Amino acid sequence: MPRHRTLENSFAFNRPTLVLVVLALVCALGLAGCTKGGGSGLHVKSPATGEKDVPVKSSYAYAVTKTFTDITGKMTTASAYNTDAANYDLDATNFAMTLDKPLTSDDQVRVMFSLIGEQGTDEKAPLKAGTYSAKADKFMKVETVGIVSRKGGADNKVWLDRGTLTGEVKVTSASADEISGEIDVSAGDTSIKGSFTAKILKRK
């Protein structure tokens, strides 16, 4: 096989070629994350989309402040990072107003979810790495999960039922500019699973 031939003849090549061979082996062993690149991908299942892979072409997240009021009237807040991931180029010019533009073809799919931060935070607080559970009471919670698809010239927006939503989002990396993680949530016959990397939008 070519791979074996390359190894057998590696010492007959010059030094740069040997370096390339070593790098190729490292990638094959998964030690350098060479296969990850900048991409990510989701697997969705719903009555509208069927079961399909959704390679993520663009993804954005933006923060708002969510307010909670308990039975005594006491108010608390938390950051809510609304996240969109799609297999087409999203328009992030004006946050939700443009991210939510109608799809233009039947093969386009957009996934949406919100990540609620810790108690006492607001839209200025950075998102923390950690687990956001669908079953959390209020904070460190994933909610408002939906899938947008298109058929017959019209968008079909399906929200996963909050009462039966299970699973979690694990944010593995979070900075001021970008968040990365894995999502695995379901409700009834609708589910979303996979990885994402979202650029954080900031208000001027």
Q: Where on the chain are the PLM-derived regions?
A:
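Acidic, glycine-rich flexible loop segments
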Residues: A125-R203
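N-terminal secretory signal peptides that target proteins for export/translocation
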Residues: M1-R15
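C-terminal motif of bacterial Sec signal peptides marking the signal peptidase cleavage site
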Residues: G30-G33
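An ectodomain-focused feature that recognizes extracytoplasmic/extracellular
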Residues: T35-W159
